[in-house]
């Protein structure tokens, strides 16, 4: 699942992820959508923007996804300060990927997410 409030970035992420051979089950533009989609689609992992629009926090959403649905996140951010990173670490992230996204770093993060699953990863 992709959780990104900027539609063009979300579309770019979907192209990258599917190009790496993964399936994207849903794209959410807010924390509330992410939680609803997680209940409906049960993704293995979520690409989560740290700062979502409309006052949504990607970190808080990640906590809910982990607690309610056991979905771990790969955090995406253009500006990840130490305090934000520390807050995100409390939610057992798979990895952090800086924006702008370098495809090879995203691919490595997805591979890291796959290792414990030992099956196809659905985003």
Go through each PLM region and give its residues.
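Two-component/phosphorelay signaling modules centered on CheY-like receiver
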Residues: 6-26
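Acidic, metal-coordinating helix/loop segments flanking the phosphotransfer/catalytic sites
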Residues: 27-45
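Acidic catalytic/metal-coordinating carboxylates
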Residues: 30, 56-60
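Active-site residues of response regulator receiver
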Residues: 49-51
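Short amphipathic alpha-helix used as the core "switch/output" element in two-component signaling
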Residues: 59-71
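Hydrophobic/aromatic residues positioned on beta-strands within the core alpha/beta folds
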Residues: 76-77
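Alpha4 helix (beta4-alpha4-beta5 surface) of REC/receiver domains from two-component response regulators
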Residues: 80-98, 108
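C-terminal output helix
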Residues: 83, 101-111, 118
């Amino acid at each position: 699942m992709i959780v990104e409030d900027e539609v063009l970035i979300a579309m770019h992420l979907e192209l990258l992820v599917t190009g790496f051979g993964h399936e994207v089950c849903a794209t959410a533009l807010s924390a509330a959508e992410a939680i609803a989609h997680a209940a409906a689609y049960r993704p293995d992992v979520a690409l989560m923007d740290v700062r979502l629009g409309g006052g949504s926090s990607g970190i808080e959403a990640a906590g809910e996804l982990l607690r309610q649905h056991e979905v771990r996140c790969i955090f995406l951010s253009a500006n990840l300060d130490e305090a934000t990173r520390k807050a995100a670490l409390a939610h057992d992230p798979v990895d952090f990927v800086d924006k702008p996204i370098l495809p090879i770093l995203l691919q490595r993060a997805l591979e890291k997410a796959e290792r414990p699953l030992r099956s196809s990863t659905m985003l």
